[in-house]
Design a protein with these regions (language model features):
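Low-complexity, intrinsically disordered terminal/linker segments enriched in charged
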Residues: 148-167
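Sec-dependent N-terminal signal peptides
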Residues: 4-15
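A short hydrophobic beta-strand element
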Residues: 112-122
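Short, surface-exposed coil-to-beta transition loops
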Residues: 117, 130-137
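Short, low-complexity N-terminal intrinsically disordered segments enriched in polar/charged residues
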Residues: 17-50, 54
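Short, cysteine-centered beta-strand-loop-beta hairpins and adjacent loop/turn segments enriched
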Residues: 69, 123-132
């Protein structure tokens, strides 16, 4: 009887972990597609609108943590997309390059939950001037769509360097 119970629990855990890995891989592919779309948007001068709303839930929130805001700053979906479009209108671009993707875990159970963690390097450009930076993100999903992104980067350093080019 003990062997049967052990086998049952082992099989249950295996299939549970396998499902979580499938959710992670699906979410990761969706996120990689989003990054590709953002990079193309900034490279292609014929694109005026960033068609990425379908990647996010309606109540998506981007959380950032600039200096002096230890609780962070919340940016809504519409403001997040508008900010990227405004960057392009100001003749700025961003290219997200080197990326390391890892599976995320549930904060309470510490088990895979389909979320994605990302360490990345990016370049923000104004004309021919470039600012390189690194950042870390945690990306949560609901039914295959991004519900929240938490990002940590040196916003002050990036802003300071960008301001030198904008004078």
């Amino acid at each position: 009887m003990k062997k049967i119970l052990f086998l049952f629990f082992s099989v249950s855990i295996f299939f549970s972990c396998n499902n979580d890995k499938k959710f992670y891989e699906k979410n990761l592919n969706n996120f990689k597609n989003l990054i590709e779309d953002i990079n193309i948007y900034f490279i292609d001068s014929t694109l005026n609108n960033l068609e990425m709303s379908n990647y996010y839930t309606e109540d998506f929130v981007f959380y950032s943590y600039p200096s002096g805001k230890k609780k962070g700053v919340e940016t809504s979906k519409i403001d997040y997309i508008n900010n990227l479009e405004q960057m392009k209108k100001m003749n700025m671009s961003i290219n997200i390059g080197h990326s390391i993707y890892l599976p995320g875990i549930n904060e309470e159970a510490h088990e895979l939950d389909g979320s994605v963690r990302l360490y990345y390097g990016a370049t923000i450009s104004i004309d021919t001037n470039n600012v390189e930076f690194s950042a870390y993100q945690t990306i949560n999903f609901e039914e295959g769509k991004i519900s929240g992104i938490w990002e940590w980067a040196d916003y002050g350093g990036v802003s300071s360097q960008l301001n030198q080019f904008m004078k």
